[in-house]
Amino acid sequence: MSLLENTDKIHTTQMGVGRIKRNLKLDTDDVVGYCISKIKDKNSKISRKGKNYYVEADGCIITVNASSYTIITAHLK
């Protein structure tokens, strides 16, 4: 199963929300929705390394755990 086939399972923790908002300089509280839109973007590059997926899109890198679909963190490139 790939990340794109499981976007309905993608979530994060309360700490993850704060970390992602801070790292990506986001104003929205819907960081999961924001990240899912980046993951679904046709120009995004998704790779799996070990236990995580890495999504490169619009100048940021989003890290998602491959087994739990938890967004761990996101950074600007």
Regions from the language model: what does each represent?
Residues 1-77:
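Ribonuclease/tRNase effector modules and their secretory precursors
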